[in-house]
């Protein structure tokens, strides 16, 4: 039903969900802390963002929202249409290595876009749903929230693996163990 309430992924045969099928190229890129960061690109051009929503069923979300954190134009929003198989693709105008957020799933997915390069996201909807569940958020993860390929993929994977708070009010600071971030 269009605009209706739907539930996907209910398993009646057992309490365990079937193994998540990962497409080719969906790998985790760990950070090598001994490597230096590459020089940021500083040129105007078009970046391609493509990917797939894992465990997608027709009737789920039809659009994905991207926010460019452009140092010149400030915040700029773009949308990509989602195909019947859960795939999406769009191009974004960028002025260099640009931090970008996929903001369609309740928790931001951080990655980078660069002119002339492709950023590829495999978004694990099963894990994103688990993290937002009051009953299952402390259960065993279903893998990473996202698998990222493209510019600064190791750093993007690290940013999307660990959630962090940017609200630095006194109340939020009391809950954080700041010594662990040093």
Descriptions of predicted regions:
Residues 2-182:
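A non-transmembrane, solvent-exposed segment enriched in polar/low-complexity residues
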């Amino acid at each position: 039903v269009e605009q209706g309430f739907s539930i996907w992924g209910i398993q009646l045969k057992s309490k365990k969900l079937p193994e998540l099928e990962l497409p080719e190229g969906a790998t985790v890129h760990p950070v090598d802390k001994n490597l230096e960061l590459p020089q940021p690109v500083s040129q105007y051009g078009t970046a391609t963002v493509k990917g797939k929503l894992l465990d997608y069923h027709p009737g789920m979300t039809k659009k994905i929202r991207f926010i460019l954190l452009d140092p010149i134009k400030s915040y700029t929003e773009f949308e990509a249409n989602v195909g019947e198989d859960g795939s999406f693709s769009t191009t974004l105008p960028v002025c260099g290595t640009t931090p970008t957020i996929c903001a369609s799933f309740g928790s931001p997915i951080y990655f980078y876009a660069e002119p002339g390069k492709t950023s590829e996201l495999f978004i694990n909807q099963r894990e994103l749903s688990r993290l937002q569940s009051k009953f299952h958020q402390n259960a065993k993860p279903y893998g990473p929230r996202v698998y990222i390929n493209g510019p600064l993929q190791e750093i993007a994977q690290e940013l999307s693996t660990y959630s962090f708070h940017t609200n630095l009010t006194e109340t939020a600071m009391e809950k954080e163990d700041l010594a662990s971030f040093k």
